[in-house]
Swiss-Prot record:
<feature type="binding site">
    <location>
        <position position="434"/>
    </location>
    <ligand>
        <name>chorismate</name>
    </ligand>
</feature>
<comment type="similarity">
    <text>Belongs to the anthranilate synthase component I family.</text>
</comment>
<dbReference type="InterPro" id="IPR005257">
    <property type="entry name" value="Anth_synth_I_TrpE"/>
</dbReference>
<keyword id="KW-0456">Lyase</keyword>
<feature type="binding site">
    <location>
        <position position="454"/>
    </location>
    <ligand>
        <name>chorismate</name>
    </ligand>
</feature>
<dbReference type="Pfam" id="PF04715">
    <property type="entry name" value="Anth_synt_I_N"/>
</dbReference>
<comment type="pathway">
    <text>Amino-acid biosynthesis; L-tryptophan biosynthesis; L-tryptophan from chorismate: step 1/5.</text>
</comment>
<dbReference type="GO" id="GO:0046872">
    <property type="term" value="F:metal ion binding"/>
</dbReference>
<feature type="binding site">
    <location>
        <position position="348"/>
    </location>
    <ligand>
        <name>Mg(2+)</name>
    </ligand>
</feature>
<keyword id="KW-0822">Tryptophan biosynthesis</keyword>
<keyword id="KW-0057">Aromatic amino acid biosynthesis</keyword>
<protein>
    <recommendedName>
        <fullName>Anthranilate synthase component 1</fullName>
        <ecNumber>4.1.3.27</ecNumber>
    </recommendedName>
</protein>
<dbReference type="InterPro" id="IPR005801">
    <property type="entry name" value="ADC_synthase"/>
</dbReference>
<feature type="binding site">
    <location>
        <begin position="315"/>
        <end position="316"/>
    </location>
    <ligand>
        <name>chorismate</name>
    </ligand>
</feature>
<dbReference type="InterPro" id="IPR015890">
    <property type="entry name" value="Chorismate_C"/>
</dbReference>
<dbReference type="InterPro" id="IPR019999">
    <property type="entry name" value="Anth_synth_I-like"/>
</dbReference>
<dbReference type="InterPro" id="IPR006805">
    <property type="entry name" value="Anth_synth_I_N"/>
</dbReference>
Length: 500
């Protein structure tokens, strides 16, 4: 592999730059500090050279560029599998005989296809982000590893996973006010071509002098749902009966809201403006658009320190606002105090922190919890949050840790598998991207990902906004229905702002 690296003048308008580059198989990841809301980094995948799709036990790797085709040949040799119709098709069989939970992590799985992207490259990249894969793990990725039913996709059709390998990447550091443009070349024949692509990106970045200007279209402002309040409340009561029977302690029940969405990038602009979050993302595939502003880390792994982090969020209150919709700081402080001292919310949160600690225990030799029961605030809601940290055991990597963790207890329940079975029965359709994760893996072995919440899946100009609520024995059904709408509201408002 040949690493190509260019420096460029700082550009404070990543979305304006991405607008010029937006096409299928591109993405924009951004981050903002929780307290100050200041933007910290932006990562733009300007061109992908490979696309990886996982459906059940089959991973299909397709080249998107001639450079990607050269790498596909090397992957074919690495996996000892021939290329068929410009694609590498890898099949994985689940070993049902292994009983040890730790040993299960090392059984062959579709995750090995992602590992192969990095293991097959013998030359260490000059920059850890020159070789980078980014994408989406669906909620149903778990089904390969656990004995769970396979549901049909009705709204959100994201595959078990879909990842891209970057050919051209732009990293903007808003703190350091620096820009790096990276290229991954897998054959000497394409070095000149990719070097020119980086120069073109550099010139394009220099030309961006102002921020993104959102667009508006004639579209309906109406919102519908796949489940009415009354039906959702019945499902809450059904889960509470299972809790009384001792089947589960908690489950996260969700429903979907639907809107017309013709201007996805503009809706993302409004979302990140009103709801700056640690994880903001816009992914454009050939089949769909996925964007969001997630407050919750799925798994963050630093290969240099060998530490993994999980950031459980559970416990929600509306922000304190006046009649005009502005923050009333006295009322907001009262809402924060009420959240921190609510027995039901605290008990639910501590239970999910314990679940996160147990997930971390499978792969870590040392672990601890800090920032216990802290409050993070966003545009419409505030949350109780904690942070669980662990040092991974020898032989474990980021994907072993992710396998141990998925799916987040804050999006499934406790006990996790029992809760998911009940969720599948009640929701009766694939969640797709919702409750899964969006993130990246780089060549040094690090991973950063967020839980796919506060997100919108758009296909054929139809937006699907899914939101859930944690159900425990003390839950008030109407309150839980209201909570799902409150969590979806930031997305609904963002899309409405793109309507004429």
């Amino acid at each position: 592999m040949i690493s190509l690296i260019e420096k460029a003048p700082y550009i404070p308008y990543p979305l304006a730059l991405y607008e010029k580059l937006e096409q299928p198989h591109t993405l924009l990841f951004e981050s903002a500090e929780i307290e100050s809301k200041a933007h910290t980094k932006s990562l733009l995948m300007a061109k992908a050279c490979l696309k990886l799709i996982c459906n059940h036990n089959i991973v299909t790797i397709t080249s998107l560029t001639p450079n990607g085709g050269a790498f596909l040949q090397k992957l074919s040799a690495f996996f000892k599998t021939p290329i068929q119709d410009n694609a590498l098709i890898l099949t994985y069989t689940k070993n049902k005989k292994t009983q040890d939970e730790f040993l299960k992590l090392f059984e062959p799985s579709p995750f090995d296809a992602l590992r192969g992207l990095f293991k097959s490259v013998k030359t260490k990249p000059k920059h850890p982000f020159t070789l980078l894969s980014a994408g989406v793990f669906s909620f149903e990725m778990l089904n390969f590893f656990e004995d769970l039913p396979h549901l049909k996709a009705k709204d959100n059709t994201v595959h078990d996973f879909i990842f891209y390998l970057a050919q051209n990447l732009i990293i903007i550091d808003h703190k350091e006010k620096s820009v790096e443009i990276l290229g991954a070349c897998f054959d000497e024949r394409f070095k000149t071509e990719i070097a020119q692509e980086l120069q073109d990106l550099k010139e394009l970045a220099k030309s961006i002098k102002s921020d993104f200007v959102p667009k508006k279209s004639k579209q309906s402002r109406e919102v519908s749902a796949n489940c009415s309040d009354s039906e959702f409340e019945k499902r809450v009561l059904s889960l509470q009966e299972e809790i009384k029977k001792g089947e589960i302690f908690q489950a996260v029940l969700s429903r979907s809201f639907y809107m017309e969405c013709l201007e996805g990038l503009s809706a993302y602009y409004h979302l990140k403006l009103t709801n700056p979050s640690p994880y903001m993302f816009y992914i454009k595939d050939s089949d769909f658009i996925l964007f969001g502003a997630s407050p919750e880390s799925a798994l963050k792994y630093n290969a240099l320190t060998n530490t993994a982090e999980i950031y459980p969020i559970a416990g929600t209150r509306l922000r304190g606002k006046d009649k005009q919709g502005n923050i009333d700081y006295d009322l907001d402080s009262k809402m924060e105090f009420d959240l921190q001292h609510d027995y039901k919310e605290r008990a639910e949160h501590i239970m999910l922190v314990d679940l996160a600690r147990n997930d971390m225990a499978r792969v870590s030799k040392k672990r601890y919890c800090d920032k216990l029961l802290k409050v993070d605030k966003y545009s419409n809601v505030m949350h109780l949050v904690s942070r669980v940290v662990g040092e991974l055991k020898k032989g474990c990597d980021s994907l072993h840790a992710y396998r141990s963790f998925m799916n987040a207890g804050t999006l499934s329940g406790a006990p996790k598998i029992s809760a998911i079975r009940l969720i599948y029965q009640l929701e009766n359709q694939r969640r797709g991207s919702y409750g899964g994760s969006v993130g990246y893996l780089n060549s040094e072995g690090s991973m950063d990902s967020c839980i796919t919440i506060r997100s919108c899946f758009v296909k054929n100009n139809r937006a699907v906004i899914q939101a859930g609520a944690g159900i425990v024995l003390d839950s008030v059904p109407q309150n839980e229905a209201n909570e799902t709408r409150a969590k979806a509201q930031a997305l609904i408002d963002a899309i409405r702002k793109t309507s004429l």
